[in-house]
Amino acid sequence: MRVLQGFLRIFFRHFYTSLAWSYDLVASIVSVGQWDDWVLSILDPAPAQPILEIAHGTGNLLHELARRQANSFGVDASRQMCRMASRKLKRNGHASTVVQAKAQALPFQQESFAALLSTFPTEFILDPASMAEAHRTLQAQGQYRIVPMAEIRGPGYFDRVAGWLFRVTGQYAELPATWSQPISEAGFVVRMEDVNLSRSRVTRLIATRSSRKEGQVA
């Protein structure tokens, strides 16, 4: 299992860079067509504005936010992902609002955003430097919404196969109670919740910026 997880770590590193062109297709296939629904679940209810998406990928969520005329911006560490997201926005008649940057060093002033969003982030999400930057750039009582994973639960054959693959490759697992501790310690009040869709269950974390440095789990 460790060998498999090591291989997947290398694969995902290329998936976000040299293989970024294949991201949307692969995501749709492995999720059995549910990927967009999982990503968009982070917008219910509509977040306050202005909004920053951290690790925006190919820009699907930014495109939806722009379609809703939301005041939104995006950052991603991958040059390839930034290029793809910018092209997608412009192709659909929207201004490009993406910046290449790491979550650990956001190029924005203090309390710039009312909401931060991240869907299916990699390990950076629990880096104390990332959470410190999230706390710095969020307004008082602002929300950092995170969708860390989804579970495929449909009864169909392909859903069952995909669900099994998600489990054996570690793409889905029950989050331990301590998973959100680094987020709480960064100064957020954390609430975990499930979003039930027709063929899957999405795990969603709502982290509200606390005025003090030690948060708590709600």
Which residues are covered by each model-predicted region?
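A short glycine-rich, Lys/Arg-flanked "PGG" loop and its adjoining helix->strand segment in the class I
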Residues: 129-140
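A short SAM/SAH-binding and catalytic strip from SAM-dependent methyltransferases
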Residues: 115-128
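Class I SAM-dependent methyltransferase SAM/SAH-binding core
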Residues: 52-105
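Core SAM-dependent methyltransferase catalytic element
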Residues: 188, 192-218
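Conserved class I S-adenosyl-L-methionine
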Residues: 1-46, 60, 159-166
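Short alpha-helix
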Residues: 171-187
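A short acidic, Gly/Pro-enriched loop at the edge of an enzyme's catalytic core
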Residues: 104-115
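Conserved beta-strand signature within the Rossmann-like core of class I S-adenosyl-L-methionine
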Residues: 142-148
